[in-house]
Amino acid sequence: SVVVQAGDSQRAAQGTPVPVRPAVQVRDQYSNLVAGAAVAFAVDSGGGSVTGANPTTNGSGIATVGSWTVGTGNNTLIATVSGTGPVKFHATGVVPGAPKQLIVTAGNGQTGLIGYALNVPPAVEVVDSEGFPVPNKLVTFAVTGGGGSVTGDTMTTGTSGIATVGSWTVQLGANTLGASIPDAGVTNNPLSFTATGAAPDYDISIRPLTTMSPSRRAVFDSAAAHWERLIYGDVPDIPVNIPGDTLKKYCTGRTTPTLNETIDDIVIYAILDSIDGPGKVLGRAGPCYIRSSGFQPVIGVMFFDTADVASFPFDVVVTHEMGHVIGFGTIWGGRFLNLVVGPTTQGGTDPHFVGPQALAAFDRIGGTGYTAGAKVPVENCCTPGGGSNDAHWREAVFGDELMTSFLGATGVPKPLSVLTVASMGDEGYQVNYAGADAFSLTFAALRAQAGGGQAVPLVDDILRLPIGVVDARGRFVQWVMPR
């Protein structure tokens, strides 16, 4: 038998989904719950539509439609299981009345980097006296304080009743933005958003341990400045006093001065030396010491093979490896932030990054229709335990994105995408989405299809060093192997 489990007798604005998704429960002839039964949902009347029309029942015998969007007036939906049913759901599609209230739906109370758009564009919902969304209302957004600016200042509400400003760029200190409609008698009209503009306060200190030309040093400084535009918020300063021989043994592998200072926010040693000759390992990098609270790195090291620095785009490799020192792929694991599910080191075949900011950014760049596995796909291409797996975006999906495990062909851009920036937000950093390079999965797929030269694998570019953990006072806590 099949019975209604949830979602009958609802009301919703025409052209919008009902608030509770219809669900049925299936039992066999002995009243036992049936798992794995195929259920078909179909619109019976009213002119609405459904998504996820063919679910299967779960362990509780329940199957739920993806969504049911209603038309005007009376609507019915039927659910059928082979050999039984159908059962019917009812809903009323309401024509929204006049606007009665403006409601904040997104983007209030943010902090962002001055001179850049906030990560979440402010959005407002227009509703009638019953709380139903009102479509086709013109909403005007205007800066009311702080001296910032907006794009897309006049927007029209959709069927959801929501209008979203194109972007809101903030200046230092307090910023305010108003949203209004021309109708009279509307509560919260205008509606006010607040935001705080912050100056950049994340500092990367590059410490060369080998001789390098001014042009090579400039590449490191440029890469640091790039990351400092993307990670802008301060992290706790850490006072350290680490002997040079300890740094040599556990971090740099060479003579290193004693580090006796308060680190704000990370010190990165840079070394140009022979690794393994031309065309193999281009560089290796990773954190040497991390904070006990939050796990953000405080000291790290980057090695680059002198046999390769002139043969590949050095700036791209340095920017990539610096990302690993800061934490990309190196503090994701279960010993730290536990951001990767199904890593290849534990026998997984579809490792994926599960940070909420990255998941949202993946959809933003075109990942909503991704069906080849779980989101967000992490590299699984290579020998288990190798330096590429579980620590990069998956090359087969992301193509030329900077933080995949392959270096693109000469002349092919390697954009540092909003996905990578968002992943750093999941690591606990304050990040600036608007500083990311333009990137989409469609672009990545087209680039992969077009070819355009030989991609070079960034083989074993993650350092496998014990990572020292230090507390807020710089006291050593423990050594941890990265994975």
Where do the PLM segments sit?
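Extracellular zinc-dependent metalloprotease catalytic-domain scaffold
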Residues: 198-319, 324-483
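The feature marks long extracellular or luminal low-complexity segments
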Residues: 1-199
